[in-house]
Regions:
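Conserved hydrophobic core element of enzyme catalytic domains
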Residues: 9, 22-151
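Short acidic, Gly/Ser-rich segments with clustered Asp/Glu that frequently serve as metal-coordination loops
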Residues: 1-6, 20-23
Length: 151
């Protein structure tokens, strides 16, 4: 639905469906959807149409975002947002900010989530969030064990 706002409808296609990608602490099912951007749409238009990513918010996205606002006690901050750049040639290289540690005033914050669907098991979803946050938590643990040079 997001790409149909900024792409030629007949060009929008699933080019990869539920491929398994393995990472150090988790596995992901990955699907790719591509389309030819409309001539009157810029890179920023594509960004605005596709973020926040439905994979993190749920669907239908407008209602899912309302529910998130109603239920979650605090803002997600950068989690689920975007890290990257836009250049003057109209290119962009962006990544969704997940499984990251955000540090402010010496305090690190790690957020992780799981996809809740009809047959979700709460214990399994909780275990998934622990697995997803493990790398960032380990990095914080290592950083806290380091001593400044000369100490």
């Amino acid at each position: 639905n997001d790409l149909l706002k900024v792409c030629e409808a007949k060009t929008v296609a699933v080019t990869e469906f539920m491929a398994i990608e393995r990472f150090s602490h988790i596995m992901h099912l990955v699907s790719s959807v591509e389309g030819t951007v409309l001539e009157n749409c810029s890179t920023v238009d594509v960004f605005k149409a596709t973020f926040p990513a439905g994979t993190l918010s749920g669907a239908p996205k407008p209602r899912a975002l309302e529910i998130i606002t109603e239920l979650e006690p605090s803002s997600r901050g950068l989690y689920g947002g975007v890290v990257g750049y836009f250049d003057f040639a109209g290119n962009a290289d962006l990544a969704i900010a997940i499984r990251s540690a955000f540090v402010r005033d010496g305090i690190a914050r790690v957020q992780a989530g799981a996809g809740i669907v009809l047959d979700s098991n709460p214990d399994s979803e909780h275990a998934e969030t622990i697995s997803k946050s493990a790398s960032a938590l380990r990095a914080i643990d290592i950083a806290n064990s380091l001593k400044p040079i000369g100490s």
